[in-house]
Amino acid sequence: MTGLQRTLTSLEVHRRRRVGTLIGGVLLCLVVAFFLIDIATNPRFGWPVVGAYLFDPQVLQGMLLTIVLTAVAMTAGIALGVVLAIMRVPGNPVFAGVSGVYVWFFRGTPLLVQLIFWHNIAALYPVIALGLPFGGPSIVLGSANVLITPLGAALLGLSLNEAAYMAEIIRSGISSVDEGQLDAGRALGMTRSKLLRRVILPQAMRVVIPPTGNQVISMLKGTSLVSVLAISDLLYAVQSIYSLNYEVIPLLLVSCIWYLVLTTALSIVQSRLEERYGRGFTPRRIVRVKKSKEPIR
């Protein structure tokens, strides 16, 4: 055995004792324990009522609608966001300008205001028609109140708002692709669309997935805003119940529990996707070692 091999085999890892961290952890655990005990023993929380309504059919139906709203709005938002992000790619200043104005407007106005606006769009356009501008021929599709229902207004508002955020996320992912990858694709004779499908978007996924997962979770919670449009989502369902029995806090806790369950499931899916697309990019862990005092012979 050489001297270098003896040195490597005699290395020992010594962890520093951090007394302050240990004391802080113990104190934090005590505070959390007292807080949980107070919540569990406080009769004003109405835990029996929570258990009675946790699996109520009206609550479960509202939760199902919340999931549907999240899935449809995110799908439409991602699809439109991809288009807007591609429009921002340098090459056509008109497309880039239109995309930039769209992102500026929808990110700069509150989502609740947008939902109420789309719900009252009939005040501006009582009849929805397709046709040429400036008095050209048109085809009347129908009344705005009939075509844009409260559920349609909610999906429209959520999707258009989400597209603005997804456009920036996808654009940042596209910008993260190394220029050398693009040059290699061009050298192989790839067209612009094929380069986007085969080179840019697959590599951008590693950057896009983490913030997209956060957006899905945010969308799930943001669907609670549609309750102002009298749509029977999860929040509106519990509101309808506590407006009859006046058990406000217990019913709000029911909605919180289901939101936590759904967001936890989405977080698990997000972490799995990050592991899948992050293979080969995980940084190596560096362990600091302390040399042994044993002399080398």
Summary of predicted features, one role per range:
Residues 1-297:
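Transmembrane alpha-helices and adjacent helix-loop boundaries
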